[in-house]
Amino acid sequence: MLWIMRFSGLFSAALVIIVLSPSLQSFPPAEAIRSSHLDAYLRFPSSDPPPHRFSFRKAPVFRNAADCAAADIDSGVCNPSLVHVAITLDFEYLRGSIAAVHSILKHSSCPESVFFHFLVSETDLESLIRSTFPELKLKVYYFDPEIVRTLISTSVRQALEQPLNYARNYLADLLEPCVRRVIYLDSDLIVVDDIAKLWMTKLGSKTIGAPEYCHANFTKYFTPAFWSDERFSGAFSGRKPCYFNTGVMVMDLERWRRVGYTEVIEKWMEIQKSDRIYELGSLPPFLLVFAGEVAPIEHRWNQHGLGGDNVRGSCRDLHPGPVSLLHWSGSGKPWFRLDSRRPCPLDTLWAPYDLYGHYSR
């Protein structure tokens, strides 16, 4: 188990070390970025893919511990002993996605029992991920950006408008029906604990599980027009909605399919196009549908907001306490800051998982 505390002096850079600490507090909320129509989802574009623009080192081979179930090399996606993880892949965040996968394998007691589902809108990424992780259990799914392009409205940040951010809305349709549960993870995080612990989250009657932050100012995620119109604000009637970050979720896909939550989210996106009820991209529709109906997960599984602000160069600190997942949500990403030689102290925790071949340490 990893416990992390940061110490800093007035004129010196912060030193990040691993220590024991009794409690965990969380950062203020930050928008999660990255993150029946099945034929459309799986239709690959006809244009020739562009050449690879990246070079990654081959990851070490990680084997199951002795007490794991016997790993079946030829086992398919429907093997009930598998832990399913879904992550998006695109060129801008590819380095982060590969670091996330590397971190999961490194800290998993049964890495050969983890199956990765990669969502892509660019088709030339599968060979790259397979060459980096030759023994990884994986499947790549093409997500057609046109599925959501007409539903996306302008946001406060252009990055929040990317169609692939909305692919998580369609996981229940994209993944095979035999996959009944999945962990969805953003591309700007690392896992420093056994992913199987997150997988075992008890959802009860809930469709998704995530760390909740009930101290956050929930009203700011929606416009005054939303709160002043009972047709919209009435969505939270009978609920006690709390903010949650959609970059780390355990999802019951079987229940999702049964209720038809993809269509419910799409309806809210259509309302947004005509009535402008929120500003923050793909997050508010999830809040509208699930806030107040989320199975709580320990905050250690999403220490989010570490990205800070690239424009102002602000850095965030970890609060004392146990940490199982570090999430660089926000506009600043560790690989950009490391390359510019202006890293934040916590970026050094991400660096060991970076497999990018052109980065020298």
UniProtKB/Swiss-Prot annotation:
Q: Give the pathway listed in the UniProt entry for this protein.
A: Glycan metabolism; pectin biosynthesis
Localization, UniProt? Golgi apparatus membrane
The biological processes this protein is annotated with in GO are:
cell wall organization; pectin biosynthetic process
Q: Name one GO molecular function term.
A: polygalacturonate 4-alpha-galacturonosyltransferase activity
Gene3D superfamilies assigned = Spore Coat Polysaccharide Biosynthesis Protein SpsA, Chain A (3.90.550.10)
Carbohydrate attachment residues? N217
Membrane topology, from the record: Single-pass type II membrane protein
Reported function: May be involved in pectin and/or xylans biosynthesis in cell walls.
Q: What is this protein called?
A: Probable galacturonosyltransferase-like 7
Give the species. Answer: Arabidopsis thaliana (Mouse-ear cress)
Protein's gene: GATL7
